[in-house]
Every structure is written in structure tokens, then in C-alpha cells.
A protein has these predicted regions:
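Histidine-dependent nucleotide/RNA phosphoesterase domain, centered on the 2H-phosphoesterase fold
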Residues: 1-185
């Protein structure tokens, strides 16, 4: 049996980020905005994941994070991939995620040995807030992103890394935790 897997760090929404997400939701029917209780920083997207590999994946996460202690990360700034002019994904940035950035190389190597392909693009700390599904009212969305480009959305204590699964539904993806690795334990 397989599931759509990924490794992530949860990010709390908070009132400022929740209000920003609500502004985006109202700005354009072309956006599919992520529920703020589902926000996360993806460390590594795995894709189709055999349930039998879960213990090895968790061991890989545990080994990669062995020296990490809980730390503070700041949710700050906005942007879009690949660019504001050609938005597919709207994101908020994460400052202070360097501890996670440092483990991505070892995770990539260990997960490649388990059959997961390496990510070709460099890792960038961000939280996906919305996906663009059409082209209606995107100028309004661009203006909102520009206004909030350096906005502080709050801080978050990173104290765990999760193996998660994603179930795609017509309303959007629903995420659940498969296993958790606590930092500093």
C-alpha cells in the first residue's frame, strides 16, 4: 500500500497570517488557499511512499535531526513561484530555518538510497499559502503580495519534524501525521 508522503515542519497560523489568508481568499476565485490549520514547511516531498518504508524513513529523519534542538523560526514576507508575473504558488517566507536547511543534504542522500529521487531545485524555506488555479483577479493578488512583501506574520517554535501523508480531495489536500520525530530527544 502506498500514500502520498512528505517530510515537514508544522507552522502555526496566528491571527496576522489568518487575516492575510482571508484577504487572499476574498481577492480572487482563482486561488485555492490552504486552511491555516494545515500550514507547514515542506522539508522534502516524497510522492508515492510504500508503507513498509515508514520505519526506514523515520530512522533517516531521526539521524538527520540528531543534533538539532528546538528553535524559533519567523514567518515573514510573501512571494510567488515561479514569479509574481507568472504565479502558480503563493507563499510566505520563513526566517531562521537554517537548521532545517542544513539537514536537507543528508536527508536527500539517505532518501535517495531508499529510492526517492533527489530534488533538482535548491531548497527554499517557505510555506505554501495558496495555489493559483485560474487567472481571474490576479492583479489584485499581486498588489496584496506587494503590500505584504516584508510583513511579519509571527514566530513559531520548531520542535518536531513529521512524516506526513497527503490525501487529495476536491476541496484541496488533507494532511495527516504518519510519524513524528521530536527535536532534542
Amino acid at each position: 500500500m502506498t500514500f502520498r508522503g512528505f517530510i515537514a515542519v508544522d507552522v502555526a497560523g496566528g491571527p496576522v497570517l489568518n487575516a492575510f489568508a482571508a484577504d487572499l481568499r476574498r481577492a480572487s476565485p482563482s486561488l485555492k488557499v490552504v486552511d491555516t490549520d494545515q500550514l507547514h514547511l515542506t522539508v522534502k516531498f516524497l510522492g508515492d511512499t510504500e508503507e513498509g518504508l515508514v520505519p526506514e524513513i523515520v530512522t533517516t529523519i531521526r539521524e538527520a535531526t540528531a543534533d538539532l534542538r528546538p528553535f524559533e523560526a519567523r514567518v515573514r514576507g510573501t512571494g510567488a513561484f515561479p514569479s509574481l508575473g507568472r504565479m502558480n504558488v503563493i507563499w510566505v517566507g520563513v526566517d531562521g530555518a537554517e537548521p532545517i536547511a542544513r539537514i536537507t543534504d543528508s536527508l536527500e542522500a539517505s532518501l535517495e538510497a531508499l529510492g526517492f529521487p533527489r530534488e533538482r531545485r535548491p531548497w527554499k524555506a517557505h510555506v505554501t499559502l495558496a495555489r493559483v488555479k485560474g487567472r481571474q483577479d490576479l492583479d489584485r493578488v499581486r498588489r496584496i503580495l506587494e503590500v505584504h512583501a516584508s510583513e511579519e506574520f509571527g514566530t513559531h517554535t520548531v520542535d518536531a519534524v513529521h512524516l506526513k501523508k497527503s490525501v487529495l480531495t476536491p476541496q484541496g489536500a488533507v494532511y495527516s501525521v504518519v510519524e513524528t520525530v521530536r527535536l532534542g530527544q
